[in-house]
Amino acid sequence: DVLTPATEISLDAARKISKHAQLGDLVNVDVKTQAFGRIAAQTAKQVIIQGIREAERGMVFDAFASKEHEILTATVLRILPDTGDMIVRIGGGSDKTDAMLAASEQVHGERYKEGDIVRVYVVEVRRSTRGPQIIVSRTHPGLVKRLFELEVPEIASGAVEVKSIAREAGSRTKIAVHATEENVDPVGACVGPRGGRVGAVVDELHGEKMDIVVWSEDPEKFIASALSPADVVSVTVLPGLTK
Protein backbone atom coordinates (compact mmCIF):
# COMPACT_ATOMS: atom_id res chain seq x y z
CA ASP A 1 0.00 0.00 0.00
CA VAL A 2 1.10 3.58 -0.65
CA LEU A 3 1.39 5.31 2.73
CA THR A 4 3.18 8.50 1.68
CA PRO A 5 2.07 9.65 -1.78
CA ALA A 6 4.67 12.41 -1.85
CA THR A 7 7.52 9.87 -1.80
CA GLU A 8 5.90 6.52 -2.66
CA ILE A 9 4.11 5.00 -5.65
CA SER A 10 2.52 1.61 -6.26
CA LEU A 11 4.47 -1.24 -7.86
CA ASP A 12 2.26 -1.06 -10.97
CA ALA A 13 2.96 2.65 -11.38
CA ALA A 14 6.68 2.08 -10.81
CA ARG A 15 6.82 -0.59 -13.55
CA LYS A 16 5.33 1.87 -16.02
CA ILE A 17 8.49 3.93 -15.44
CA SER A 18 10.94 1.05 -15.06
CA LYS A 19 9.68 -2.42 -16.02
CA HIS A 20 12.23 -4.14 -13.75
CA ALA A 21 11.19 -2.22 -10.62
CA GLN A 22 10.74 -4.24 -7.41
CA LEU A 23 9.22 -3.44 -4.03
CA GLY A 24 11.53 -1.13 -2.08
CA ASP A 25 13.43 0.09 -5.16
CA LEU A 26 14.12 3.76 -5.83
CA VAL A 27 12.67 4.97 -9.12
CA ASN A 28 13.85 8.18 -10.77
CA VAL A 29 11.03 10.35 -12.05
CA ASP A 30 11.73 13.18 -14.49
CA VAL A 31 10.18 16.47 -13.42
CA LYS A 32 9.35 19.07 -16.02
CA THR A 33 10.59 22.36 -14.63
CA GLN A 34 8.24 24.22 -16.94
CA ALA A 35 5.49 23.17 -14.59
CA PHE A 36 6.88 25.35 -11.83
CA GLY A 37 5.56 28.87 -11.65
CA ARG A 38 7.75 31.93 -11.27
CA ILE A 39 6.67 32.46 -7.65
CA ALA A 40 7.42 28.85 -6.71
CA ALA A 41 10.88 29.09 -8.28
CA GLN A 42 11.60 32.34 -6.44
CA THR A 43 10.46 30.77 -3.16
CA ALA A 44 12.78 27.81 -3.69
CA LYS A 45 15.66 30.19 -4.40
CA GLN A 46 14.99 32.14 -1.20
CA VAL A 47 14.85 28.93 0.85
CA ILE A 48 18.21 27.82 -0.54
CA ILE A 49 19.82 31.24 0.06
CA GLN A 50 18.43 31.35 3.61
CA GLY A 51 19.81 27.89 4.30
CA ILE A 52 23.25 28.95 3.06
CA ARG A 53 23.19 32.08 5.23
CA GLU A 54 22.19 30.14 8.32
CA ALA A 55 24.98 27.64 7.68
CA GLU A 56 27.49 30.49 7.32
CA ARG A 57 26.24 32.10 10.55
CA GLY A 58 26.57 28.77 12.33
CA MET A 59 30.15 28.41 11.13
CA VAL A 60 31.03 31.92 12.33
CA PHE A 61 29.42 31.26 15.73
CA ASP A 62 31.31 27.99 16.13
CA ALA A 63 34.57 29.70 15.16
CA PHE A 64 34.25 32.46 17.76
CA ALA A 65 32.34 30.75 20.60
CA SER A 66 35.59 29.12 21.71
CA LYS A 67 37.28 32.54 21.80
CA GLU A 68 35.22 33.97 24.67
CA HIS A 69 37.52 35.58 27.28
CA GLU A 70 40.37 35.70 24.77
CA ILE A 71 42.19 38.69 23.27
CA LEU A 72 41.85 39.12 19.52
CA THR A 73 43.43 41.55 17.09
CA ALA A 74 40.89 43.75 15.31
CA THR A 75 40.95 46.29 12.51
CA VAL A 76 38.88 49.46 12.80
CA LEU A 77 36.50 49.58 9.82
CA ARG A 78 34.53 52.69 10.69
CA ILE A 79 33.59 54.94 13.57
CA LEU A 80 29.97 56.00 13.98
CA PRO A 81 30.03 59.81 14.37
CA ASP A 82 26.80 60.07 16.36
CA THR A 83 27.70 57.55 19.08
CA GLY A 84 31.45 56.99 18.85
CA ASP A 85 30.86 53.24 18.54
CA MET A 86 33.46 51.48 16.39
CA ILE A 87 32.83 48.69 13.90
CA VAL A 88 35.86 46.40 13.95
CA ARG A 89 36.79 43.30 11.99
CA ILE A 90 38.16 40.33 13.89
CA GLY A 91 39.54 37.03 12.73
CA GLY A 92 40.94 36.19 9.33
CA GLY A 93 40.23 34.17 6.23
CA SER A 94 36.84 32.46 6.21
CA ASP A 95 36.48 33.02 9.98
CA LYS A 96 36.54 36.82 9.89
CA THR A 97 33.50 38.77 11.01
CA ASP A 98 32.54 42.23 12.23
CA ALA A 99 31.94 43.25 15.83
CA MET A 100 31.02 46.46 17.59
CA LEU A 101 33.31 48.07 20.12
CA ALA A 102 30.77 50.29 21.86
CA ALA A 103 31.83 53.72 23.09
CA SER A 104 31.09 52.54 26.64
CA GLU A 105 33.64 49.74 26.16
CA GLN A 106 36.39 52.08 24.95
CA VAL A 107 39.02 53.56 27.24
CA HIS A 108 38.70 57.31 27.75
CA GLY A 109 41.61 59.02 26.05
CA GLU A 110 42.32 56.29 23.50
CA ARG A 111 41.85 57.57 19.96
CA TYR A 112 41.51 55.45 16.86
CA LYS A 113 40.93 56.01 13.18
CA GLU A 114 39.82 53.78 10.33
CA GLY A 115 42.46 51.18 9.52
CA ASP A 116 44.02 51.16 13.01
CA ILE A 117 44.84 47.85 14.67
CA VAL A 118 43.48 47.34 18.20
CA ARG A 119 43.48 44.39 20.57
CA VAL A 120 40.08 43.65 22.10
CA TYR A 121 38.78 41.31 24.78
CA VAL A 122 35.91 39.01 23.77
CA VAL A 123 33.36 39.33 26.56
CA GLU A 124 30.62 37.15 25.07
CA VAL A 125 29.47 35.48 21.86
CA ARG A 126 25.68 35.35 21.42
CA ARG A 127 23.34 33.81 18.86
CA SER A 128 20.80 36.12 17.24
CA THR A 129 18.44 36.15 14.26
CA ARG A 130 20.95 38.35 12.41
CA GLY A 131 23.82 36.03 13.10
CA PRO A 132 26.34 35.81 15.94
CA GLN A 133 26.82 38.91 18.09
CA ILE A 134 30.37 39.26 19.41
CA ILE A 135 30.69 41.59 22.40
CA VAL A 136 34.20 43.06 22.64
CA SER A 137 35.74 45.49 25.11
CA ARG A 138 38.83 47.50 25.97
CA THR A 139 37.64 48.35 29.50
CA HIS A 140 36.76 44.90 30.88
CA PRO A 141 38.92 43.67 33.81
CA GLY A 142 39.25 40.40 31.92
CA LEU A 143 41.51 42.17 29.42
CA VAL A 144 44.03 42.90 32.18
CA LYS A 145 43.83 39.35 33.51
CA ARG A 146 44.36 37.83 30.08
CA LEU A 147 47.31 40.14 29.36
CA PHE A 148 49.02 39.00 32.56
CA GLU A 149 48.30 35.36 31.69
CA LEU A 150 50.06 35.90 28.37
CA GLU A 151 53.03 37.73 29.89
CA VAL A 152 53.60 35.79 33.13
CA PRO A 153 54.51 32.09 32.79
CA GLU A 154 53.79 31.49 36.47
CA ILE A 155 50.16 32.53 35.95
CA ALA A 156 49.84 30.37 32.85
CA SER A 157 51.24 27.36 34.75
CA GLY A 158 49.05 27.94 37.83
CA ALA A 159 51.92 28.72 40.21
CA VAL A 160 50.44 32.20 40.61
CA GLU A 161 46.71 32.83 40.70
CA VAL A 162 44.89 36.08 39.96
CA LYS A 163 42.32 36.36 42.76
CA SER A 164 40.64 39.68 41.95
CA ILE A 165 40.92 42.77 39.79
CA ALA A 166 39.55 46.27 40.34
CA ARG A 167 39.89 48.49 37.30
CA GLU A 168 39.27 52.12 36.47
CA ALA A 169 40.02 51.79 32.78
CA GLY A 170 42.55 54.29 31.49
CA SER A 171 43.59 55.38 34.98
CA ARG A 172 44.54 52.62 37.41
CA THR A 173 44.11 48.90 37.99
CA LYS A 174 44.69 46.94 41.17
CA ILE A 175 45.31 43.22 40.75
CA ALA A 176 45.48 40.82 43.71
CA VAL A 177 47.65 37.74 43.21
CA HIS A 178 48.36 34.63 45.26
CA ALA A 179 51.11 32.01 45.03
CA THR A 180 49.91 28.41 44.96
CA GLU A 181 53.46 27.06 45.28
CA GLU A 182 56.09 27.66 47.92
CA ASN A 183 59.08 29.87 47.18
CA VAL A 184 57.18 31.77 44.50
CA ASP A 185 56.89 35.54 44.86
CA PRO A 186 53.56 36.34 43.17
CA VAL A 187 54.19 40.08 42.90
CA GLY A 188 57.74 39.63 41.66
CA ALA A 189 56.59 37.11 39.06
CA CYS A 190 54.05 39.60 37.71
CA VAL A 191 56.50 42.49 37.70
CA GLY A 192 59.15 40.42 35.93
CA PRO A 193 62.87 41.05 35.43
CA ARG A 194 63.48 44.80 35.31
CA GLY A 195 59.71 45.31 35.26
CA GLY A 196 59.45 43.85 31.78
CA ARG A 197 56.28 41.83 32.29
CA VAL A 198 54.15 44.49 33.92
CA GLY A 199 55.69 47.01 31.54
CA ALA A 200 54.36 45.07 28.55
CA VAL A 201 50.86 45.14 30.07
CA VAL A 202 51.09 48.87 30.81
CA ASP A 203 52.24 49.56 27.25
CA GLU A 204 49.28 47.66 25.81
CA LEU A 205 46.96 49.71 28.05
CA HIS A 206 48.61 52.98 26.98
CA GLY A 207 50.17 53.87 30.31
CA GLU A 208 47.42 52.75 32.69
CA LYS A 209 48.90 52.54 36.20
CA MET A 210 49.16 49.02 37.58
CA ASP A 211 49.21 48.14 41.30
CA ILE A 212 50.00 44.49 42.05
CA VAL A 213 49.22 43.39 45.61
CA VAL A 214 49.35 40.14 47.55
CA TRP A 215 45.98 38.54 48.20
CA SER A 216 45.33 37.15 51.68
CA GLU A 217 42.54 35.16 53.31
CA ASP A 218 42.91 37.51 56.27
CA PRO A 219 40.66 40.50 55.46
CA GLU A 220 42.77 42.92 57.50
CA LYS A 221 46.00 41.95 55.74
CA PHE A 222 44.35 41.99 52.34
CA ILE A 223 42.76 45.40 52.89
CA ALA A 224 46.08 46.84 54.06
CA SER A 225 47.81 45.39 51.01
CA ALA A 226 45.11 46.64 48.65
CA LEU A 227 45.44 50.19 49.96
CA SER A 228 49.07 50.40 48.88
CA PRO A 229 50.98 52.55 48.10
CA ALA A 230 49.32 54.38 51.01
CA ASP A 231 50.86 53.82 54.46
CA VAL A 232 48.29 51.88 56.49
CA VAL A 233 48.59 52.23 60.26
CA SER A 234 45.93 49.66 61.13
CA VAL A 235 42.83 47.95 59.78
CA THR A 236 39.90 46.92 61.96
CA VAL A 237 37.04 44.82 60.65
CA LEU A 238 33.88 45.60 62.59
CA PRO A 239 32.16 42.44 63.88
CA GLY A 240 29.01 41.51 62.02
CA LEU A 241 29.64 44.11 59.32
CA THR A 242 31.21 43.95 55.90
CA LYS A 243 33.35 47.06 56.39
Where are these regions (language model features)?
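RNA-contacting regions in translation and RNA-metabolism proteins
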Residues: 1-243
